[in-house]
Amino acid sequence: MIIDVHCHAGKGDGLTGPWDTAAPLADYLRRATAAGITHSVLLPAFSSDYARANRELAAIVAGAPHRFWGFCFVHARHDRGRVARLVHTAITRYGFVGIKVHRHDAPISREICDAARRHRVPVLYDVAGEVAPVELLATEYPDVAFIVPHLGSFADDWRAQLALIDMLVRHP
């Protein structure tokens, strides 16, 4: 079984790039199938309204639950005070299995980590090159699984990647 744990799907409400405009799955599924990928974790495209984006993603996941697993997207700043409710809805109503957070939106918060702990789900946190908080996450939330994509830097910042590798060695 090969799992792709980082695939955006659906429509965002921005127009700056594919990450916030539209992430259709047809071409992706063709390539994934050819590569032997049997399951995909889907994440909503960037949006100014992640509650809506999560609902839309739930419909996509429900269309092929044997193939797709959903992670809800939350915004640490805009969703402050309602993260627990958003995550609870995503896990219990939509059947999602994790949380997605992006540093581009705002730094991860205790509210998000506490929701992950409460529901016992992983957090996929794109740190966007800011790897220092990963050590704090490892020590403050040792019982929460954190997935740090792109080796800590989408832009291939080797300094950030080496720093992340060092932290991973110290906090396996």
Predicted segments with their positions:
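An N-terminally biased module of ancient metal coordination in phosphate/nucleic-acid-related enzymes
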Residues: 1-56
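Active-site gating/metal-coordination segments in enzymes
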Residues: 47-125
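Active-site neighborhood of phospho(di)ester-bond hydrolases with catalytic His/Asp-centered motifs
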Residues: 2-5, 41-44, 71-72, 100, ...
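Catalytic pocket-lining loop regions of alpha/beta-barrel enzymes
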Residues: 105-172
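N-terminal cationic-hydrophobic initiation segments that often serve targeting/anchoring roles
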Residues: 32, 61-65, 91, 138-139, ...
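Short, well-ordered coil/turn segments that N-cap beta-strands
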Residues: 1, 36-40, 64-70, 93-97, ...
